[in-house]
């Protein structure tokens, strides 16, 4: 294998091994979307204490609780936001936002949720 091919292979492997980088811009956009679409139930700080959420028979998720949120995969969070709670075995009070939000927007919201969870999710676990 020549040098060019080796360098290409090393770059590919390094790219696959590196954790996915989430930009500050993605998180900032996620926060804007979160405030618009999620905060009514989950609260602006993400504690599940939004004005509409307080009147529900099931309390909305506290996105700041890292002990709980870190157990959920990004894929699961994407599904619950996109398809709604009932589609993933959770509360049917969680609406499906897949018709209003595209995949990038939902990914940005997940990125923002990850940023407010304490303790934060660590990679590789």
Question: What are the functions of these language-model segments?
Answer:
Residues 54-62, 80-116, 121-125:
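Axial heme c-ligation environment in periplasmic c-type cytochrome domains
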Residues 30, 34-44, 94, 109, ...:
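The canonical Cys-X-X-Cys-His
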Residues 31, 47-78:
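Gly/Gly-Pro-rich "capping" loops immediately C-terminal to redox-active cysteine motifs
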Residues 8-18:
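Bacterial N-terminal signal peptides
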Residues 1-8:
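Positively charged n-region of N-terminal signal peptides that target proteins for export
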Residues 18-33, 123-125:
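Electrostatic cytochrome c docking/interface patches
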Residues 26, 33-34, 73, 77, ...:
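Stable alpha-helical elements in mature extracytoplasmic
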């Amino acid at each position: 294998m020549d040098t060019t091919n080796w360098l290409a292979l090393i770059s590919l492997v390094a790219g696959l091994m590196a954790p996915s980088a989430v930009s500050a811009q993605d998180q900032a956009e996620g926060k804007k979307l979160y405030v618009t679409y999620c905060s009514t139930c989950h609260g602006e700080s993400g504690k599940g204490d939004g004005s509409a959420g307080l009147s529900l028979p099931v309390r909305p998720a506290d996105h700041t609780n890292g002990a709980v949120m870190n157990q959920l995969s990004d894929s699961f969070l994407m599904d619950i936001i996109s398809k709604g709670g009932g589609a993933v075995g959770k509360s049917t009070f969680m609406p499906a936002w897949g018709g209003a939000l595209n995949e990038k927007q939902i990914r940005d919201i997940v990125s923002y949720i990850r940023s407010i969870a304490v303790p934060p999710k660590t990679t590789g676990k």
